[in-house]
Amino acid sequence: MPNGTKLAKSFLWKKCDSCNILISKFDFYKHDKVCPECNYHFPMYSSERINHIIDLKSWIPLYNNLLSGDPLGFCDKKPYITRLAENQKITGLDEAVQTGIGRINNISASVAVMDFNFMGGSMGSAVGEKITRLVEFSTKEELPIVIISASGGARMQEGILSLMQMAKISAALERLQSKGLLYISILSSPTTGGVFASFAMLGDIILAEPKAVVGFAGKRVVEQTLNEKLPPNFQSAEYLLDNGFVDLIVKRKQLKKTIHMILDLHN
């Protein structure tokens, strides 16, 4: 196939990562990046998720001035500070989470949306601080909070500083929930590592997208550690639902309506 034809095809069609059918780009975006054939939910950018659940022109971003430093002077294949700059340029984001307030079908809420495209959605000190401040803002203003997780876990380039964010966010959520305020946690694929082991699983209501990968360590690591074969659906949203760790699996098309229903019932 000529290169020009391949390029034109890539602009017009999207191949499903699950069932391999070709989806027209029109249908792909019409269905909110969900395969119309097999219901596979493609990853979304944080800005797309905000546009998907927040009422038009109601989004007010908060804490955009918080950026990660490099206190450890960490360097693997390249310096951490260089890696941050590259991800900022590629994604147009300052960090792996967007935080702010907005309305969901006319109900005000604080919202944090993680973005896997920024360093695998990893949680460093800036991500932890942004979410913590948003939780504290919600507590002060008596607002419900919605957090959409998409993360590989704690950011290794920040060492213990990234791990302490797990406890910091969890403590802030405890103060919010002790005031009777609502926290809705939404698990998208993947939600793993330190994010899974902390705030993602602390919601009063925990929702998940269909077939989302949710768990702590990778399946292969767990199998090698335990020397046992795990169930085929292990670390899936459906497995967690069957075992009581998730309250509801919600298709993307129904997500805003479902969040609004829960917020309305709580109000």
Curated annotation (Swiss-Prot):
Pfam families in UniProt: Carboxyl_trans (PF01039)
Gene Ontology CC entries for this record: acetyl-CoA carboxylase complex; chloroplast stroma
Enzyme class name: transferase
Gene3D superfamilies to which the protein is assigned, alphabetical: 2-enoyl-CoA Hydratase, Chain A, domain 1
Recorded catalytic activity of this chain's protein: N(6)-carboxybiotinyl-L-lysyl-[protein] + acetyl-CoA = N(6)-biotinyl-L-lysyl-[protein] + malonyl-CoA
Keyword terms, alphabetized: ATP-binding, Chloroplast, Fatty acid biosynthesis, Fatty acid metabolism, Lipid biosynthesis, Lipid metabolism, Metal-binding, Nucleotide-binding, Plastid, Transferase, Zinc, Zinc-finger
Primary localization class, coarse: plastid
Single GO molecular function: ATP binding
Matches recorded under SUPFAM superfamilies: ClpP/crotonase
Residue ranges of domain CoA carboxyltransferase N-terminal in the record: 12-267
UniProt pathway: Lipid metabolism; malonyl-CoA biosynthesis; malonyl-CoA from acetyl-CoA: step 1/1
Residues annotated as binding Zn(2+): C16, C19, C35, C38
Subunit structure: Acetyl-CoA carboxylase is a heterohexamer composed of biotin carboxyl carrier protein, biotin carboxylase and 2 subunits each of ACCase subunit alpha and ACCase plastid-coded subunit beta (accD).
NCBIfam families, sorted: accD
Function: Component of the acetyl coenzyme A carboxylase (ACC) complex. Biotin carboxylase (BC) catalyzes the carboxylation of biotin on its carrier protein (BCCP) and then the CO(2) group is transferred by the transcarboxylase to acetyl-CoA to form malonyl-CoA.
Family that this chain belongs to: Belongs to the AccD/PCCB family.
Record protein name field: Acetyl-coenzyme A carboxylase carboxyl transferase subunit beta, chloroplastic
Lineage of origin: Eukaryota, Rhodophyta, Bangiophyceae, Cyanidiales, Cyanidiaceae
